[in-house]
Amino acid sequence: MAFSLVKLRTSNSPIQIGSRWCTAKARWVLCLLLTLSTGLVADKATASGAECDRLASIAADPDHQSAPVDYNGIDGPKVIDACREAVMQFPDNGRYWVQLGRGYLKIEQGNAMLEAFQKAKLLGYPVAWFALAVVYHTGNGIDEADLNRAEILYKEAYQRGVGYAALGLARLYDEPGSPFFDLEKAGVWESRFDALKDRLG
């Protein structure tokens, strides 16, 4: 951690160190501790965000910041601890909310999962539409699937730049017995996903 050196004067005039005000009569140790505490809080916030990314990054997210973690690799309690801390520090970061939702999904807390995904959607985070589409497509974490809602959400996610939504639509349309079964549509969306695959990784 970098420090700024300040020469203390013998007068009572205030001296700013970091964002705290100290006087020359105050012990420099106290001033230093106050400055360090501010830096430590910032470091902790950054660490919780990085840990949330490390534990629950989603491949479908065009803005993922760490190597993606598949569903089997999710450790629900650890993800919840790290990502809950991250959203407390950065409540407007949609990525952390989506990743928090993955933690809740893993431990089958459906209501908390939906709240986290919906929060990310309200923040305008694109992959939130995809996460909700998968939930309504599969029925995981909710009472029952809603394919109409899933289709709408997949298409909105795709329009917002989430390429994996094309794969979701292909799977939605290629399920025999489903009211959405349509091999022609499935082929169109599969082709769109294949065209993006190299870029998506």
Feature names for model-found ranges:
Residues 48, 89-92, 123-127, 138-140, ...:
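Short helix-capping/linker turns of helical repeat alpha-solenoids
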Residues 43-82, 87:
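N-terminal leader/linker segments that initiate helical-solenoid repeat arrays
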Residues 25-39:
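Bacterial N-terminal signal peptides
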Residues 73-74, 106-114, 122, 138-145, ...:
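Short coil/turn and helix-start
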Residues 1-24:
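N-terminal secretory signal peptides that target proteins for export/translocation
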Residues 100-106, 131-138, 168-176:
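Hydrophobic face of amphipathic alpha-helices that form TPR/SEL1-like repeat modules
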